[in-house]
Amino acid sequence: MRRALVVAPLLSCVLLAAGAPAVPLDAARAYTPLGVRIEATEYRGRKALRVVEPAVGQGGGIALAHGITFASGTIEADLAGAPAPGAAEGARGFIGIAFRVQADPQRYECFYLRPTNGRTDDQLRRNHATQYISEPEFPWQRLRKEQPGVYESYVDLEPGVWTHIRIVVDGTRARLYVHDAPQPVLIVNDLKLGDTQGGIALWIGQGTEAYFSSLKITPK
């Protein structure tokens, strides 16, 4: 039986299965912050988890969800990202979800968005609105240099606006869906960590102020 694990960043962690109870969790205790600071708040009418760097420009990081091991299946999230006050000119509001996070939490797969690229007049930047990376061996710089355009794509985005994303992972393949679209905006057929498993984390890049209002995981 497929079971959906819903991690509501503020208040609860709920395993959705026949008769399964809700397990209340405090937001700060539901995640381990690694290179980020997290706090419960309200944003644009929703209870949310705010994720920022301890100091703007330090390089981003992750908030690792407790008690989750994920191999294949579906990950859904509602998120909103924008450049943080005082961020450098190159900040794009980088925000996403890391998956298959390894015991060394610097090793993971990730899909993320660049919200300020979504409606810019620069077509090349628009083409870079979404991104796949596999840290630490395959950051965006290496992927763009070695295979330009393969691990990035366009999608309409607005900074600071709630955006629904869905990541479907199957073995060494993954698909990113945005705005409940029936077709993926980015397809990866060669996940760099291979067919493995690991944790799930909220992800932000350098100079980002991020908000997450839900996280739902459905194992395959």
Residue ranges and their predicted role:
Residues 7-15:
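Bacterial N-terminal signal peptides
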Residues 1-4:
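Positively charged n-region of N-terminal signal peptides that target proteins for export
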Residues 19-220:
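Extracellular glycan-recognition regions
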